[in-house]
Each structure stands twice: as C-alpha cells, then as structure tokens.
Amino acid sequence: MMTAWAVLGGFVLDAIFGDPAWLPHPVVYMGKAISRLEKFLRSRLPKTPQGELLGGAVVAFCLPVGTLLFTGLVCWGAAMLHPLLGLAVQMFWCGQALAAKGLAQESTNVYRELVKPDLPAARRAVSRIVGRDTQNLTLEGVTKAAVETVAENASDGVIAPLLYMLLGGAPLALTYKAINTMDSMLGYKNEKYLYFGRAAAKLDDVANYIPSRLAALLWVMAAAFTRNDAKGAWRIWRRDRRNHASPNSAQTESACAGALGVQLAGPAYYFGEYYPKPTIGDPLRPIEPEDILRANRMMYVASGFALAFGCAIRGFLG
C-alpha cells in the first residue's frame, strides 16, 4: 500500500511542480554516466563491430543495474530510518520519473508560437522536444512534430514509468528511465551507434513492449472521454501501430492520429539525413495548432486512467 501512496504522491508532485530547472534531475546524471562510460569503453575496446557491440552491452548492463542498486539502497536506508522518510524519498523520485507537466508545458510553448504566428520561434520551441531537424519545418510540420512527441512521450515519459513504479516503486521506475535515457542517447542507426547502441535500443524495445500497448489502449479510452474519435483511434491503432522502425513508437502515435483524424509521421530529416518513414493515420482534415492541446488533454486523461487502474490493482493485491 505504501507503494501506491508513493506513486500517487509522485503523480501529484509532477502535476504541480513538474521539473524545476534549479532542481537536479536523475536523468541528467544518467546522461553524464552514459557519456563517460561510452568514452571510457571506446578508448579501450577494439574499434570493430564486435568491440562496439561489447561496449554497448556493458553500458546497457551497468547503467540499469547501477541505478536499481543505488536507488534501492537509498530507499531502503531511508525507510529504515523512518517509514515516512522512506515514503517521502519514494514520492520525490516517483515525481521526477514522470514528465507529464514538462511535456505539456513544452508542447504548449510550441502552440503559443504557432498561433502568434511566429514560425521561427515555433521551430526553436519544438526543437527542444524532438530529435528531427526543425530548421526547415513548415507550420504543419512543426504542429505534427509536437503532436507526435506528446503521443509518444505519453507512453515512455508518463504511462510506462507509472506502471514500473507501481510494480517496484521509485527504484524500478528510475531503472526504466535509465534504459529510456540510454536509448535516446545511443539508440541511433547511424554509423557511430549502429553497433554500440544496439543493446540499449533492444533493451528499450523490451522495456516498452507491454507499456506502449497498454498506453495505446488507454489513449483510445481517453479519446472517448475528451470527445475525440475513439472509434477512429481504435481503427488506426489496429492498422498503423507497426508503421515505425521501433515496435513501440507507433502505438500511441497511431491511436492519437486516429483520435484526431489527422495524418502523422512520414518522411523527416535527422542530422541532415533524409529518412523516408511511413505515415500514420488518414488526413481526414488538415492538422492545426489546437491539435497540440487536444493531444495534451488525451495524454493527461490516459495518464489518470493508468494511475487509477494501477493503484486500484496494487491496493487489491496489497
């Protein structure tokens, strides 16, 4: 039951405070650890596919295991000092593992620039939350990028961490964040990371496999509660959920596209290189800046469903 209270408290903390810039965040330290490990291993292992595969596997093992051990020991030690201190530490870290408010704030900043309209400012705003090249995006392209990142990050930034913290408290949620951070830094299929990042990418695929599909189903439910097209969300999810190189990324994107009646994804540039990605959804109408706000509403409702169902199940199981 204490875990459910920690998750609920963390959800409220994220909803109220988000991630203040002045507060150190675990993901920052995870990123530094990944960079240092990568630099260390690349300097000592053979510069061959086998050497890079080994180096990447070492990172993919050390960071999650180290995160789980460190956070688990801290939570255990705090609980030994006093149960309420243990609960407070778990609440704090659970809040940091969630990104709902930060995602909503950043995407809403994009919306505000689009409706001014200030396209250069909107491109700069969206560049903070997407990995693609943004300098030549049209208004439609900026809007699509923002909606896509809300949909995708609703899964790996909110619902997946919620599910993991309900299973294993803050330590397991932060271990998931370590896996997700590795993938975001190393999981590129370019010359530099094709081999070194493979283990991180595969581990992220496994960690997100079930949460991403649950998130898509919750998104369909959220579409109904926010007066979007739930039937369309279900239909497009069933049809287009595999339209991505990742087995997980198109799950919530397809549900979102169907709920809004717009087309997402498609070709994009990353680091100056053209990627001919398939589209997701049908262009029943042109995408518009207000779709960013609609996506955020569905993200919050889907997250609320995940919290409610998860806490109820956790409470029932004890």
Regions found by a protein language model. Name each.
Residues 1-175, 179, 187-318:
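Hydrophobic alpha-helical transmembrane segments
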Residues 184:
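Glycine-rich phosphate/dinucleotide-binding loop and adjoining beta-alpha-beta core of small-molecule
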